């Protein structure tokens, strides 16, 4: 079992190159299944979840190669297998995205019910019901979702009862090769959906309205090859901005876009931080000041992202004042608070709200990561706590943060990865 040993307290300052967004790379990799010709993707992050996706694609018969520059070539022209198996899918919920492209192009697909982070219910029901409205026949059998269609799927009006990034992406992929026009109402508006639509359109799809709550897709008969650069990771960007805010530092995030992160930047400014933006950089300068407490309510984009909630929990537990953080997207997403409390934080959980009473300093402790974003908040807590903090279960971090130790060391953190042969 791998762990991080983090020494503190240190001020985190410097420049960080932001990686491609995991939450765009994964759906785009699965969407490449729709193309009859090879596609080339650049800015694909080097992550566990990306590797798992490569393995799933290869299991389907897709040729996947990453060259020395990091570019990924995907050739789905010779797919000969239509099942995404349990042993791969169990580690990653995003694997449900294999289903829509398979049934859209080959009229059949099977995906094991997925795994991933343990942050409450993330049902696949909306993916399934939307495909059924487009003419797919769905069976749930022995832990697998099996989808078939009699010829091409057909366009439909799909109203999302709840704003869902995953289901919006599934429908968008399926609709590209459907007969007729599909309209998604109450669609998710995340930048990663916009990026996936840009990729699909580069392959010849006809998608309009991505980034708004109504997306229209006119089906085409086939999709062809293209080149596409994955959008920068706004959550990684936000994470490093928070690192500067909580440590009294100044960090510039390079190769990123401020317009994908407006709610987060607004809250950082409200916390008393100076944030300056250019076309492709965002800089946070704390001026050595302690942040002020800010209330947070997670919402679908363009609201405050749930994937930044844990980082702002850390900010609030070391801020001046008391704050309330309300989580409206996922259940059970405050598992980092008891761990932060072990480090001297004063956080309470009341249902879907956390109340944070700011303290001046954290102290080191042994803590355990519970999901991807919680884990990075514990690592940053270790960077600003006095003494040596051990963070366990860091495999969560490797799912979503590329070369995290190198990037943290580059801004002044003292962090090392080590292995224990067995769990005590």
Swiss-Prot record:
Q: Where is the protein situated, by its record's location annotation?
A: Cytoplasm
The catalytic residues are 117
Residues at which UDP-N-acetyl-alpha-D-glucosamine binds: 93, 162-165, 307, 329
This enzyme catalyses: phosphoenolpyruvate + UDP-N-acetyl-alpha-D-glucosamine = UDP-N-acetyl-3-O-(1-carboxyvinyl)-alpha-D-glucosamine + phosphate
User: Where does the record place the modification 2-(S-cysteinyl)pyruvic acid O-phosphothioketal?
Assistant: 117
Quote the cellular component terms of the Gene Ontology held in the record. Answer: cytoplasm
Q: Where does phosphoenolpyruvate bind?
A: 22-23
Reported function: Cell wall formation. Adds enolpyruvyl to UDP-N-acetylglucosamine.
Regarding protein family, the annotation reads: Belongs to the EPSP synthase family. MurA subfamily.
What this protein is called in its record is UDP-N-acetylglucosamine 1-carboxyvinyltransferase
What lineage is on file? Answer: Bacteria, Pseudomonadati, Pseudomonadota, Gammaproteobacteria, Pasteurellales
